[in-house]
Regions:
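Long, well-structured alpha-helical subdomains associated
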Residues: 206, 212-216, 222-223, 277-305
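Extended, basic/helix-rich recognition subdomains
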Residues: 238-298
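Boundary at the C-terminal end of the N-terminal hydrophobic targeting segment
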Residues: 15-17, 22-23
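Sec-dependent N-terminal signal peptides
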Residues: 4-13
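Catalytic nucleophile serine of serine hydrolases
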Residues: 32
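Conserved SGNH/GDSL esterase-like catalytic core that processes O-acyl groups on lipids
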Residues: 25-26, 35-124, 130, 149
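Alpha-helical cap/lid subdomain in secreted, periplasmic
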Residues: 91-255, 276
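Short hydrophobic segments within beta-strands
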Residues: 27-29, 143
């Protein structure tokens, strides 16, 4: 009888854990990678019509654990120092953490330190302590970020054989896993989602494009980049000279990547089935969107186990 009751309790807990979430207040303390993750999240929630959310993003481009903590100390010393914005208003980190009764607060490393956990402390510990002090009701999650494009310049040069996108993925994953275990904080599988989609997608990305002249590019031509989830090459106008510059971003998610990230966060936090989500960004085809949603659903389900 005891065994039966135990099994019933376990089954009930599992069933409750898998119930769709109808409403959530979620704050990210991050950088451009949390901006990528949030880009389409609100629209996905709205278009699916099965949940509501309050989303906050205390983000500064290139912001590490250390910088977030330093910004907080500056705000303590000078209350006028408010480096973040929420609903159009300047905010300190204290302001942000107390602006809503957040259900979830996510934290993450800056990407170029994501595989260097020796640079995270004591700043990550300090931020976690601050969250627990100012938002004790919130559950802390670790945002496991992604590896750069395989053709990112960071992987080339004299040490090119010692580092790669594969190694960045593996090493950052190990570092985030250790942080997750330290704080008993679940890990959001953004890195897994982008990596899995890149490996399994039917259209494989080929970079560099053998037909493109990278040394003598002509505006507005761009290399073929089908299957990319991270931006790659683009043209940018110099505000001073008004000349077009051939530019490379091997770090940030493109529209496909941002849609995949949004779907992953939605499936992970709201436990929603994406089969009947009919919305996607204009530059993502319905067929591709279906594939990306399937990856998001699977990766989110695996991470929630």
């Amino acid at each position: 009888m005891k065994k039966l009751l135990t099994l019933i309790v376990i089954f009930c807990i599992a069933a409750i854990a898998d119930e769709p979430v109808a409403a959530l207040k979620l704050l990210s303390i991050g950088n451009s990678f949390s901006v990528n993750a949030h880009k389409y999240l609100g629209e996905i929630i709205k278009q699916h019509g099965k949940a509501t959310a309050v989303l906050g993003n205390a983000a500064i481009g290139g912001c590490s654990f250390k910088r977030h903590w330093d910004e907080h100390l500056k705000s303590v010393a000078d209350p006028a120092h408010k480096p973040y914005r929420y609903k159009g208003k300047p905010m300190s980190l204290r302001d942000y953490l107390t602006a809503e009764k957040w259900d979830v607060v996510t934290i993450q490393s800056v990407s170029h330190q994501s595989y260097k956990p020796e640079l995270w402390q004591p700043y990550a510990d300090n931020l976690v302590a601050l969250i627990k002090e100012l938002a004790p009701q919130a559950k802390i999650y670790i945002h496991r970020t992604w590896a750069y494009r395989p053709d990112n310049f960071r992987f080339f040069g004299p040490k090119k054989n010692k580092f790669s996108a594969q190694l960045m993925y593996e090493q950052s994953g190990a570092a985030y896993k250790a942080l997750s275990e330290k704080y008993n904080a679940p890990m959001i599988p953004s890195g897994e989602a982008l990596w899995t989609a890149f490996q399994e997608q039917p259209v494989k990305n080929v970079s560099p494009d053998p037909a493109f002249d990278y040394k003598n590019p002509v505006h507005p031509n761009l290399p073929k980049d089908d299957g990319a989830l991270i931006k790659g090459y683009y043209w940018k106008k110099d505000p001073k000279t008004q000349e077009w510059k051939f530019t490379f971003d091997g770090i940030h998610a493109n529209s496909r990547g941002e849609y995949l990230l949004g779907c992953t966060w939605y499936a992970y936090f709201f436990k929603q089935n994406l089969d009947d989500l009919a919305w996607q960004p204009k530059d993502v085809t319905p067929e591709d969107a279906k594939f990306l949603r399937s990856i998001a659903q699977r990766v989110a389900a695996q991470a929630a186990k």
